[in-house]
Amino acid sequence: MNRLKEKYIKEVTPSLVEKFNYSSVMQTPKVDKIVINMGVGDAVSNAKNLDKAVEELALITGQKPLITKAKKSIAGFRLREGMPIGAKVTLRGERMYEFLDKLVTVSLPRVRDFHGVSKKAFDGRGNYTLGIKEQLIFPEVDYDLVDKVRGMDIVIVTTANTDEESRELLAQLGMPFQK
């Protein structure tokens, strides 16, 4: 079993039950899934850029990404409906816990001038969104093979009903929030 999942079961669950006075252990919030999205805007003019982004996302997550397509045509961006413009991965179960563990312990501390992640990025339903400016913070990405610095959005979906519960869950799992 993954280190973070073990910590969740043995330490986080009992402390959350105690803090929020749940009547059952099953009421405790848990991480449901993690969605990583990489929008590749320049894929409109050069489709090869998307292949590189897909390759990097597969390296980072250990799972084959889904290529996302444009929902609407936008003339200003020379974009047609159905054109491939990005990639996304949905992680659940073991891979999700492995990715979260790696993100919290290895990748986020590698960000330049890192003072913790924002406490304000919750959506009101207990989900947390995190933007990353460069893919180089992940140890799997080889610096020499990177053609262009790309960012990504990471959405951590929890079963929590409020932001407060979700914040407490993520903080206990090791998410470095700003002081």
Curated annotation (Swiss-Prot):
Q: Which domain of life is it from?
A: Bacteria
InterPro entries for the chain? Ribosomal_uL5, Ribosomal_uL5_bac-type, Ribosomal_uL5_C, Ribosomal_uL5_CS, Ribosomal_uL5_dom_sf, Ribosomal_uL5_N
**SUPFAM superfamilies the UniProt entry points to:** RL5-like
Span of the signal peptide: none
Its BP terms in the Gene Ontology are: translation
Q: List, in alphabetical order, the Gene Ontology terms for molecular function in this entry.
A: rRNA binding; structural constituent of ribosome; tRNA binding
Alphabetically ordered keywords of this record: Ribonucleoprotein, Ribosomal protein, RNA-binding, rRNA-binding, tRNA-binding
GO CC terms, sorted: ribonucleoprotein complex; ribosome
Cite the Pfam families for this sequence.
Answer: Ribosomal_L5 (PF00281), Ribosomal_L5_C (PF00673)
HAMAP family recorded: Ribosomal_uL5_B
UniProt-listed PANTHER family = 60S RIBOSOMAL PROTEIN L11-RELATED
NCBIfam families in the cross-refs: PRK00010.1
* Protein purpose: This is one of the proteins that bind and probably mediate the attachment of the 5S RNA into the large ribosomal subunit, where it forms part of the central protuberance. In the 70S ribosome it contacts protein S13 of the 30S subunit (bridge B1b), connecting the 2 subunits; this bridge is implicated in subunit movement. Contacts the P site tRNA; the 5S rRNA and some of its associated proteins might help stabilize positioning of ribosome-bound tRNAs.
Q: To which protein family does this belong?
A: Belongs to the universal ribosomal protein uL5 family.
- Subunit organization: Part of the 50S ribosomal subunit; part of the 5S rRNA/L5/L18/L25 subcomplex. Contacts the 5S rRNA and the P site tRNA. Forms a bridge to the 30S subunit in the 70S ribosome.
- The identity of this protein, by name, is Large ribosomal subunit protein uL5
Q: Which gene holds the coding sequence for this protein?
A: rplE
